[in-house]
A protein has these predicted regions:
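Gram-negative outer-membrane beta-barrel transporters
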Residues: 84-89, 104-199
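C-terminal beta-signal and adjacent terminal beta-strands/loops
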Residues: 90, 191-206, 230-290
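Residues on the lipid-exposed face of transmembrane beta-strands in outer-membrane beta-barrel proteins
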Residues: 10-14, 68-72, 120-126, 172-176, ...
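Repeated loop/turn-to-beta-strand initiation elements of outer-membrane beta-barrel proteins
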Residues: 19-22, 76-80, 131-136, 180-185, ...
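Outer-membrane beta-barrel signature, preferentially recognizing the C-terminal barrel domain
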Residues: 30-81, 86-89, 100-127, 163-168, ...
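Structural signature of outer-membrane beta-barrel domains
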Residues: 19, 29-33, 75-77, 87-91, ...
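Outer-membrane beta-barrel translocator domains and adjoining extracellular loop/strand segments
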Residues: 35-41, 48-49, 92-100, 145-158, ...
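Signature of Gram-negative outer-membrane beta-barrel scaffolds
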Residues: 1-19, 43
Length: 290
């Protein structure tokens, strides 16, 4: 897996005035397969509750990124940014199903021909002093993404988004910072849209040794809330409390299939492929600086 690559990048900024500017950036990056992804051995993935086998034929994935961004800085520490972006993936690596040991289906890895992602992104950082909350600030990041995988000519796979890509992302948070009390508090919220976690198999798909169709596995939308508190005592001691996933909502992987009944009617049927509750993570840390 020795390759000689060139990764060009370009960043330009047009400053309209002290508060407004426009940025244009381009960059090329690489996603190399991990060792276990190119190994022919089988291992068990506890999150998927399934065996996973590597693929010795995997290739590097090359990503071209293009981003056009408008930025407005209303005041110190504040930002409103709106961006449009485009990403092209050459040979993206995806989770997929394969047949091993007869008819047993397990997860593996496979290169798609290519994929294109494009969308819009909004960033906001705002102090809340204008409503009387001088020690509070608010941040928001949201994106809408359109994703489409390109297949080899003659392939029978249907159009679909790239595995792992959500159609939307939401991250927002409230922050409290009090200098006299030497205290920082953050409450963060995150949500992702429905996304393919495992690529299924179309009937007669190129390279398949079976004509059986397996629906894609989707990770369903889920809300997460994280909390953190940091407090300094004097010049040397600091205590930190972190709570991840306060809501502890269940994680659902679902499959959707079109079923034709004996009377000729069709209906989409959904099945829960996996469901588990990850639980909360609580951490308490004490830091003493000499």
């Amino acid at each position: 897996y020795k390759t000689d690559d060139v990764f060009p990048s370009l960043n330009t900024t047009y400053k309209i005035n002290d508060q407004h500017q426009v940025r244009l950036s381009y960059g090329r990056s690489i996603n190399r397969p991990e060792f276990r992804e190119v190994s022919s051995s089988v291992y068990y993935d506890f999150d998927l509750a399934s065996n996973v086998q590597g693929n010795t034929e995997l290739k590097n994935c090359y990503v071209d990124n293009l981003d056009l961004r408008y930025e407005w800085y209303p005041s110190r520490g504040e930002l409103i940014s709106l961006a449009v972006f485009y990403k092209h993936f050459d040979s993206p690596i995806e989770w997929t199903y394969t047949v091993a040991g007869g008819t047993d289906l397990i997860y593996s890895y496979k290169n798609a021909k290519s994929a294109n992602n494009y969308g819009v992104e909004l960033d906001i950082r705002k102090n809340l002093g204008f409503i009387g909350l001088k020690d509070f600030s608010w941040s928001f990041n949201g994106a809408l993404i359109k994703s489409k995988v390109q297949f080899e000519k003659g392939a029978k796979e249907e159009d679909r988004p790239m595995q792992g890509q959500s159609p939307y992302l939401i991250n927002t948070g409230i922050f409290y910072k009090n200098e006299p009390l030497k205290m920082d508090i953050a409450l963060l919220y995150n949500r992702i849209g429905k996304r393919i976690i495992g690529v299924g198999r179309s009937e007669g798909s190129t390279g398949d040794d079976s004509n059986s169709r397996v629906p894609h596995s989707y990770e369903m939308p889920r809300n997460t809330i994280d909390f953190s508190l940091a407090k300094k005592f004097g010049e040397h001691l600091e205590l930190k409390l972190n709570v991840r996933d306060l809501l502890a909502e269940k994680i659902y992987y679902k499959q959707f299939a079109d079923v034709t009944y004996s009377d000729g009617s069709k209906k989409e049927v959904e099945e829960i492929a996996r469901c588990y509750k990850p639980g909360r993570n609580i951490g308490l840390q004490a830091i003493y600086k000499f």
